[in-house]
Design a protein with these regions (language model features):
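Double-stranded beta-helix
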Residues: 2-14, 19, 107-132
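A short glycine-rich, His/Asp/Glu-containing loop-to-beta-strand
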Residues: 17-64, 69
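Flexible, glycine-rich phosphate/dinucleotide-binding loops
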Residues: 37, 81, 126-127
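Short, conserved beta-strand element in jelly-roll/cupin
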Residues: 45-49, 65-82, 120-123
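Short acidic (Asp/Glu) patches
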Residues: 57-59, 101-104
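A generic structural motif
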Residues: 83-85, 109
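Short acidic-glycine-tyrosine-enriched beta hairpin
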Residues: 86-102
Length: 132
């Protein structure tokens, strides 16, 4: 028996639509997981916009945290550089995956021009908070 709380969802690459989001130099492809899970989860692909070239300085608010209970990042292409409070600085490349504990303070510093990643979060709708 299926769970009535969740809906079956398929998101085809050939029908993908990328939209603007949190970062001005990135575009985001919603994979439909938030709607299918009634907001419990969010899964999206994020990538550098075609008009952005070379290493990108991330235009963040500095250190921040997402008010989530789950956050996972899987790099599909290129690389990205993060600083995690209490953990250090990391460069993640194609095929690398990171699970970040809930509400960990972090900052994205730079990425390659071909950077693309899958990010999965819970809950689907959440706040991002600037921290010192």
């Amino acid at each position: 028996m299926g769970n009535k709380k969740y809906k079956f969802n398929v998101n085809y690459k050939d029908e993908a639509k990328y939209k603007d989001g949190l970062r001005s130099f990135l575009e985001y492809r919603d994979l439909g997981v938030s709607e299918a899970s009634n907001g419990e989860y969010k899964a999206h692909i994020l990538r550098v916009k075609k008009e952005c070239t070379g290493e990108q300085e991330m235009h963040t608010t500095g250190f921040h945290k997402h008010l989530v209970t789950f956050q996972m990042y899987y790099v599909l292409k290129g690389w990205v550089k993060f600083i995690y409070d209490g953990e250090g600085t990391f460069i993640f490349k194609k095929g690398d995956c990171v699970y970040a504990p809930p509400k960990i303070k972090h900052n994205e510093i730079a990425c390659s021009n071909d950077f693309e990643a899958l990010e999965i979060l819970s809950p689907g709708k959440h706040e991002t908070v600037k921290v010192d």
